[in-house]
Amino acid sequence: MKIHLVHAHPEPKSFTASMRDVIIETLEAQGHSVTLSDLYAMKFNPVASPEDFGERRDPDHLTYALEQRHNWKQGTIAPDIASEIEKVLAADTLGFTFPLHWFGTPAILKGWIERVFISGPFYGGKRVYGEGGLKGKRAFTAFALGGRPHMFGDGSIHGPLESGMMKHFFQGTLGYIGVDVVAPFIAWHVPYISDDARKQMLDDLAEYVRTLDDQPLLEMPDISNFNDRFEPR
């Protein structure tokens, strides 16, 4: 199996970096092939701009998604974007490691998504959710935060993470492009716990990765329940 891992943390010695390393070591020990985009180490440019396109469909007015589609077909999309797209398309499984920032991904990862998950091969028209461009692939996530488990979930102060604060990522991004979204591994309260507790988390993460095939999937909209205009049937 081919896995492409996207890592977003500016500190090479961070706990999130340790999670990245555990994931790679565990997958490779199972015989899988792993590629990595370490966004800070790469100095990846997260800013979408007109410079992303070598041949403008409309030189007078930038409609970013339409230019993405046009330039992908023409082979004129920026090389740094094209390289990342090829890594994603070549993978069977995508993985993401990051710290939670304001109940979302770090800005550099959000920018990577905006520039790399392009209209055309990833989504477009009725090609979303179960019919999305990456149908048949799957994605998993391991992220760290300072909060405790009791702060999240039904009836908690913040509500659920996967179907609440981070629905924009799990459904609005990963699910939208058609991948099967594995329930995430969450490292809780990381800055405030003991070294032994953090080590146990890394052991738990290794087990999560080893048993990835058995992890539950997050529920996504069933496109068959909607007509061609996405109205409920």
Predicted segment positions?
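Short, conserved loop/helix-junction motifs that constitute active-site signature segments
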Residues: 131-136
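Glycine-rich phosphate/pyrophosphate-binding loop and the adjoining helix
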Residues: 152, 157-233
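Hydrophobic/aromatic beta-strand patches that form the interior of the parallel beta-sheet core
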Residues: 4-6, 35-37, 140-143, 182-185
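Solvent-exposed loop/turn segments at secondary-structure junctions
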Residues: 102-103, 146-148
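N-terminal beta1-alpha1-beta2 submodule of the flavodoxin-like/Rossmannoid cofactor-binding fold
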Residues: 1-98, 103-121, 203-233
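A gly/proline- and charged-residue-enriched helix-loop-helix capping module
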Residues: 124-128
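Glycine-rich His-Gly loop
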Residues: 8-10, 144, 151
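Conserved catalytic-site loops of classical short-chain dehydrogenases/reductases
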Residues: 93, 138-140
